[in-house]
Amino acid sequence: MTTEDTFETAERAAAIAKAAALIESLPWLKTFHDRIIVVKFGGNAMVSEELQRTFAEDMVYLRYAGLLPVIVHGGGPQISAMLDRLGIQSEFRGGYRVTTPEAMEVVRMVLTGQINRDIVAAINKHGPLAAGLSGEDAALFQGRKRGAVVDGEAVDLGLVGDVIGVNPEAVLAQIDAGRIPVVSSIAPDIDEPGQSLNVNADAAAAALAVALRAAKLVILTDVAGLYSDWPNRDSLLSKITARELRELLPGLESGMIPKMAACLAAVDGGVEKAEIIDGRIEHSILLEVFTQSGIGTEVAPV
């Protein structure tokens, strides 16, 4: 066999492998065609330019493949960095960050004016596909102040809230127009008109997924998935039911509780499946949606 023959054989094998990968996605293309998938964008993927680029590519691929992606994002590290840059001291009470009116101005500026714009711009490099929204727009989210109890005493966290209602019309209008909605995790305070609240992006994504009757909620994290016995790496769970997660939730590492609670809220609210996946892996969304094995941890109703 000549060198040229060897090269052609290698090329043919590579082409066949690519075709096999495409065919593997066929059942999922059928399953999720014209279905909404809510993706919570966060973690290291938000601060790595390369991961931002591949995330944007994944969203564009989903849209052109006939799926209906919706993005919800937070921005804790970027908010902290901007507060430090502006010389605004962060206040903590019982381990919780207090969001003062001054800090809330920074939260709005960073989430809606910086991060949201950056995500939209990254997607729109591939065409006029993405449209930015704030949770304040058309009262998309409705929030109520959240308190905390520390050492038996009530603690005022300032302008921190929970999402207690969703008006999905603004998002649905963007979907109907063929766009990818990108939503920042801010909510108007229903008890104090004109006031905005900083809400947890995982919880906001779950609430929106329920309101949109999404087929799937995907939360990007900085770990491979849920571990039943962290830090034992062999305890990674590929799948867990809502009942099993409800039992496991109180004992989880604190950073995982909001994410897994969001997954639980989503499936309890009618979302068919929820996943946490490792956002540090390039094209992690495509690997999760379009491969048989998927990645991360899937939460199923039963």
Curated annotation (Swiss-Prot):
Q: Which SUPFAM superfamilies match?
A: Carbamate kinase-like
Q: In its UniProt entry, what is this protein called?
A: Acetylglutamate kinase
Similarity comment: Belongs to the acetylglutamate kinase family. ArgB subfamily.
Q: Which gene encodes it?
A: argB
Main location as per UniProt:
cytoplasm
Q: Where in the cell is it found?
A: Cytoplasm
Give the GO cellular component terms, alphabetically.
cytoplasm
**Binding residue positions for substrate:** G75, G76, R97, N198
Species this chain originates from: Leifsonia xyli subsp. xyli (strain CTCB07)
* Summary of the function given for this chain in its UniProt record: Catalyzes the ATP-dependent phosphorylation of N-acetyl-L-glutamate.
Catalytic activity annotation:
N-acetyl-L-glutamate + ATP = N-acetyl-L-glutamyl 5-phosphate + ADP
**Where does the record place the site Transition state stabilizer?**
K40, K259
Does the record carry Kinase as a key word? yes
Keywords from the UniProt entry? Amino-acid biosynthesis, Arginine biosynthesis, ATP-binding, Cytoplasm, Kinase, Nucleotide-binding, Transferase
| Classification via Pfam families | AA_kinase
A Gene Ontology molecular function term for this protein is: acetylglutamate kinase activity
**NCBIfam families, A to Z:** argB
- Pathway where it operates: Amino-acid biosynthesis; L-arginine biosynthesis; N(2)-acetyl-L-ornithine from L-glutamate: step 2/4
Give the EC number(s) under which this enzyme is classified. Answer: 2.7.2.8
Any single biological process term in GO: arginine biosynthetic process via ornithine
